[in-house]
């Protein structure tokens, strides 16, 4: 969609979880500038961040963690994930209060300047992302899911034929 990865500005918005950790490593390797916007005490794994930052410096890109969602400006891509990971028994009201300022809605997309919105699914519509954005023209959520299907099939084929 953007024609390149090197130099692209990616904002991950939400819980600093395994997806964020993987995005930091992949971004560092591919030369993307990745910033994680998450609430206090919900940042990605510090050890992963430090290691990915070493890679990023070698590849001329930057990684950052930010709690202030008002700083989400001038990004190319917004990426999010579910607010509640498997096995997390935190009450939904507690989760909602903590993460609602980080909801991917049209105002946040407009503020960010992003041309692409991603979500790795499953999505909880009305929580981490609104219907308007998920079904909107900047969303590549379902393309992303289709691509993941093909990747999974290729890995399975390789493993079966190994």
Residue ranges and their predicted role:
Residues 54-132, 138:
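Rossmann-like adenosine-cofactor binding region
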Residues 37, 118-120, 144:
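Generic beta-sheet signal
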Residues 10, 34, 117-118, 155:
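Hydrophobic/aromatic residues located in beta-strands of well-ordered beta-sheets
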Residues 22, 26-29, 51, 111, ...:
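Alpha-helical scaffold segments in soluble metabolic enzymes
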Residues 135-162:
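C-terminal helix-to-coil terminal segments
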Residues 18, 22, 47, 103-104, ...:
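Conserved active-site and cofactor/substrate-binding residues in soluble primary-metabolism enzymes
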Residues 2-80:
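Glycine-rich phosphate/diphosphate-binding loop of Rossmann-like nucleotide-binding domains
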């Amino acid at each position: 969609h953007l024609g390149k990865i090197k130099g692209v500005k990616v904002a991950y918005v939400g819980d600093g979880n395994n997806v964020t950790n993987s995005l930091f490593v992949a971004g560092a390797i591919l030369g993307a500038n990745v910033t994680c916007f998450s609430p206090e005490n919900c940042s990605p794994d510090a050890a992963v961040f430090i290691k990915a930052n070493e890679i990023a410096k070698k590849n001329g890109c930057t990684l950052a963690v930010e709690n202030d969602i008002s700083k989400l400006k001038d990004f190319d891509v917004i990426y999010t994930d579910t607010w509640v990971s498997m096995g997390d028994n935190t009450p939904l009201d507690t989760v909602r209060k903590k993460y609602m300022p980080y909801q991917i809605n049209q105002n946040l997309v407009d503020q960010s300047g992003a041309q692409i919105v991603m979500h790795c699914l499953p999505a909880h519509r009305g929580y981490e992302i609104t219907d308007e954005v998920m079904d909107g023209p900047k969303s590549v959520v379902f393309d992303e899911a289709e691509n993941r299907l093909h990747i999974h099939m290729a890995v399975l084929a390789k493993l079966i034929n190994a």
